[in-house]
Amino acid sequence: MIRIAIDAMGGDFGPEPIIAGVVEALKDTKFSAVLVGDSNAIKPLIPEMYLKNIAFLEAAEVISMAEGATDALKRKESSIYKAIELLKNKEVDAVVSAGHSGATMSLATLRVGRLKNVARPAIATLMPNSKESTTLVLDVGANVDCRSEHLFQFAVMGEAYAKEILNRKLPRVGLLSNGEEACKGNEVSKEAFELVSRLDSFVGNAEGNQVFDGSVDVIVCDGFIGNILLKTSEGVADAIGKIIKKQVKKSPLAIAGSVLMKKVFRTLKKQVSYDEYGGAPLLGINGCVIISHGKSNSKAIKNAIFQAINFANSNINKVIEEELSHFAR
């Protein structure tokens, strides 16, 4: 049975939505959970019937969002440190955390270690597109500054994830740039273009709109651009939702029409909501770590756990190592 460590104290809203998500996941599938945190705060939130599938690991500290990522390495009593140590010692198959993403990434990289031939791990996230599907984008925050070889490795890892986890038989990989032509981009992206061209899956440069039109399956960029893209997309989706609500309320006819469109709005909300996707895997480490949104609700945590189970049941890390070995110097 898959065993997952969950940082029960991470996230913006405390343990309540995290524990609720764990319970919802246990209702739907079989796995063993290790909840890391303050057991006195956690246990009262769990129905007794689920306790047989849950173990507890006491952690006295929590890494706050205001702290630096490197500070986490010194905080050995923190919930995320202890969760990562379980993965390092192979006592669990995966870690899920909605806490400090920088701390989670630093600990996973330095304590669990990287896969062979991976210079830097990357955070990969799914974004909705107009084809009623998703586009995998990486990196979305792990690496602010990248060299061309890092972007090439992201492309290999993204392609492998698309095949193994998303079941895309022939994924199309694009390099995010300011134009489709090979001559577009900065010096790093131009160098990366030459490297990524070695992949049969590479379809060339991709512009920002292609993240959402379904023309590519994997978008590669550095973490600085990727994080801005992610946060901007979240902001636009939220703003459009609010604009629609305000406009509907201004007209009785629009209100009547919105009732008829309720199913459409529900489907749209489901497609663009982050909680449908759960979290973002940290690709390139010697294990499975899912980084969830700090504002994760119970549904997001549940789906992050499902993500972790799928990852742990796959051969994705082996595939990444094998693919990168073909290009090792």
From Swiss-Prot:
<comment type="similarity">
    <text>Belongs to the PlsX family.</text>
</comment>
<keyword id="KW-0444">Lipid biosynthesis</keyword>
<dbReference type="GO" id="GO:0006633">
    <property type="term" value="P:fatty acid biosynthetic process"/>
</dbReference>
<keyword id="KW-0443">Lipid metabolism</keyword>
<dbReference type="InterPro" id="IPR012281">
    <property type="entry name" value="Phospholipid_synth_PlsX-like"/>
</dbReference>
<protein>
    <recommendedName>
        <fullName>Phosphate acyltransferase</fullName>
        <ecNumber>2.3.1.274</ecNumber>
    </recommendedName>
</protein>
<comment type="subunit">
    <text>Homodimer. Probably interacts with PlsY.</text>
</comment>
<keyword id="KW-0963">Cytoplasm</keyword>
<keyword id="KW-0594">Phospholipid biosynthesis</keyword>
<dbReference type="GO" id="GO:0005737">
    <property type="term" value="C:cytoplasm"/>
</dbReference>
<dbReference type="InterPro" id="IPR003664">
    <property type="entry name" value="FA_synthesis"/>
</dbReference>
<dbReference type="Pfam" id="PF02504">
    <property type="entry name" value="FA_synthesis"/>
</dbReference>
<keyword id="KW-1208">Phospholipid metabolism</keyword>
<dbReference type="GO" id="GO:0043811">
    <property type="term" value="F:phosphate:acyl-[acyl carrier protein] acyltransferase activity"/>
</dbReference>
<comment type="function">
    <text>Catalyzes the reversible formation of acyl-phosphate (acyl-PO(4)) from acyl-[acyl-carrier-protein] (acyl-ACP). This enzyme utilizes acyl-ACP as fatty acyl donor, but not acyl-CoA.</text>
</comment>
<keyword id="KW-0808">Transferase</keyword>
<comment type="pathway">
    <text>Lipid metabolism; phospholipid metabolism.</text>
</comment>
<dbReference type="GO" id="GO:0008654">
    <property type="term" value="P:phospholipid biosynthetic process"/>
</dbReference>
